[in-house]
């Protein structure tokens, strides 16, 4: 959607032919086109950057002005260890950490900045879920999400989870990145972070967990 919006904003014929109003028609049609083959009453759109203010504004202006967002927050050191472990299993070539620590880089730096900026918006339509709560009390967290959206609750069996959609991780270069295990639990990752990496993670933790954020920093890295 973001690329489409940028194209519309920089497409001279829309301006020359007085068709700027067409932009909203194009944008509002995209979700229906993307999910046209899905026959479900509820669709949960997943994306690390949806909580960024420019993306929430884009959605509210074109799709649903009262849209609600669930923001999953996880300690950065856990994210780093998980990614590095996957890189090792996938025979990653090069430094395991360096590119993950570059300003504005995906999937860690830029996402952390987006979560930080999320807190600059009115908060009534955001629900923050800590990953540690999700794995330790999954049913309680799921109830919170159902209540947040006002949906009828479903009886989940968190001890026998079935993966019904498989993402092609070959496009990410990390086979197993989106594999869902049968039970919701913490999986121990045997990765020891170097001191400079641990310090980097702690600094980002401050930005996503603290109420007071460095807005300039977040804007520059999102």
Language-model features: locations:
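PAPS-dependent sulfotransferase catalytic core
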Residues: 1-30, 164-167
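Residues at alpha-helix termini
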Residues: 9, 15-18, 40, 61-63, ...
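Generic detection of long, well-ordered alpha-helical segments
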Residues: 20, 24, 104, 135, ...
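Short amphipathic alpha-helical segments that mediate assembly, nucleic-acid/protein binding
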Residues: 23-27, 111, 197, 215
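Alpha-helical packing segments of well-folded alpha/beta enzyme cores
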Residues: 29, 110-116, 141, 200-204, ...
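Short, well-structured alpha-helical segments in soluble
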Residues: 32-35
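PAPS-dependent sulfotransferase catalytic domain
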Residues: 37-156, 170, 177-179
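PAPS-dependent sulfotransferases, especially Golgi type II membrane carbohydrate sulfotransferases
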Residues: 84-87, 119, 147-222
């Amino acid at each position: 959607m973001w690329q489409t919006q940028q194209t519309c904003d920089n497409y001279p014929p829309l301006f020359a032919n007085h068709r700027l109003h067409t932009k909203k028609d194009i944008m509002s049609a995209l979700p229906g086109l993307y999910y046209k083959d899905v026959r479900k009453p509820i669709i949960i759109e997943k994306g690390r950057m949806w909580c960024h203010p420019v993306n929430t504004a884009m959605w509210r202006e074109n799709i649903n002005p009262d849209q609600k967002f669930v923001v999953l927050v996880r300690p950065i050191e856990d994210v780093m260890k998980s990614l590095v472990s996957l890189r090792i299993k996938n025979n990653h070539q090069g430094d395991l950490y360096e590119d993950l620590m570059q300003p504005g880089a995906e999937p860690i730096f830029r996402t952390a900045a987006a979560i930080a900026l999320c807190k600059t918006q009115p908060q009534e339509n955001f629900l923050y879920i800590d990953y540690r709560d999700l794995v330790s009390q999954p049913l309680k967290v799921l109830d919170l999400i159902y209540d947040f959206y006002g949906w009828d609750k479903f009886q989940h069996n968190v001890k026998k989870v079935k993966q019904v959609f498989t993402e092609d991780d070959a496009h990410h270069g990390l086979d197993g990145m989106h594999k869902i295990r049968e039970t919701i639990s913490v999986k121990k990752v045997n990765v020891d972070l170097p001191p400079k990496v641990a310090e980097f993670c702690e600094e980002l933790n401050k930005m996503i967990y603290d109420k007071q954020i460095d807005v300039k920093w977040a804007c520059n890295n999102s």
